[in-house]
Structure formats: structure tokens, C-alpha cells
């Protein structure tokens, strides 16, 4: 019984140190009230590197605080998100391809228009201009470096 109680008390602690995520529509509404730079993370549920990366990034409390305090963060599942998304005055839809598919926005954000690479990171300034783009895994150290560079703009 004591182990269960301890477990129930510790579980919320793990969730307290996670990056706050939102949707594209939430981010655009918040941008109108309080402009901040934006970090967009494109991933898929089958991407093992994405899961490992997410674990390591959320484990770094300094990074989590920096992200939550100074940026809007959109965690975008490129192959499962099926709703229409309005972003930068354009509308994007899910492109069905048999039993799977990909969202048009994932292709629009990717420099490789035929097939996105995951994980994919897109950093925008508070005016939604591209300031950094990275395909592949992002380490906590590299993420902090980029966030500090962008927040200084």
C-alpha cells in the first residue's frame, strides 16, 4: 500500500517537468496576444529516435523551463494528425494514401518535399519567419544553444 501511495505522489512530478505543447491554432491565437518565437517538432509514432529524443529533452529541467517561459511549442504528429490546419494564412489537409498518409503541413515545413525526415525541427521568430531548421535528432545541449540564440533576436 505504501508503494502505491508513493507511486501516486511521484507520478505528477514527472509531468510537471514537461514542455508545454499546443496546436497550431492555439499558437496563432496566443501569438496575437503575446508574440513569442515558435518551435515546431514533427515526429511520428513509429520513430524510435523521436521517442528517445523527447525523453532526453523533457528530462532537462533548464531546457523545459526555457522552452515553457519564452517559446510556443507545437508537437506535431505528421502521419496521424488528420484535421485541417490553418497556418500562416494557408490551409493544410491530411493526404490519405491507402492505410496511411501524411499531413500537407509536414511536407510544407520539410525541405525534402517528397518525404519528410523525422524528427524534424522548425524554429520561427516571433514574426513566424524561419530562423533554424534541423532534420534529425536534437540533443538537449543543442536545443538550449538554439533557444538562447533565438531568444536573443
Model regions: which residues?
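A short beta-strand-turn-helix
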Residues: 20-37, 106
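C-type cytochrome heme c attachment motif
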Residues: 45-52, 120-122
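Thioredoxin-like thiol-disulfide oxidoreductase module
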Residues: 63, 68-120, 124-130
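Typically the conserved alpha-helix immediately C-terminal to a functionally engaged Cys/Sec
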Residues: 51-68
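Short active-site neighborhood of thiol/selenol oxidoreductases, capturing the structured segment around
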Residues: 34-48
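Bacterial Sec-dependent N-terminal signal peptides
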Residues: 1-20
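Thiol-/selenol-based redox modules, centered on thioredoxin-like
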Residues: 123-153
